[in-house]
Swiss-Prot record:
Organism this protein belongs to: Borrelia duttonii (strain Ly)
Pfam families from the UniProt entry: Ribosomal_L29 (PF00831)
Keywords recorded for this protein, A-Z: Ribonucleoprotein, Ribosomal protein
GO molecular function list: structural constituent of ribosome
Protein known as: Large ribosomal subunit protein uL29
């Protein structure tokens, strides 16, 4: 799980979201092939991406200030 999201800058959050999306896609491909050590990791990644998307959107609409 992501810790201290409030400490990250907006650009760091966008970069972190991109790396999490890549990791999620890799995990999806491994699931299709059939070799996944921790199937719950997919759910955790999806939720972390959603958390980051929410915070980034809050910055975009002005709920959070930079």
């Amino acid at each position: 799980m992501l810790k201290n999201l409030k400490d990250l800058t907006l650009e760091d959050m966008k970069a972190k979201r991109l790396t999490l999306k890549k990791e999620y896609m890799d995990l999806r491909f491994k699931t299709v092939v059939g070799h996944v050590e921790n199937p719950l990791k997919k759910r955790e990644l999806r939720r972390d991406i959603a958390r980051l998307n929410t915070i980034i959107h809050e910055y975009a609409i002005g709920i959070r200030k930079v």
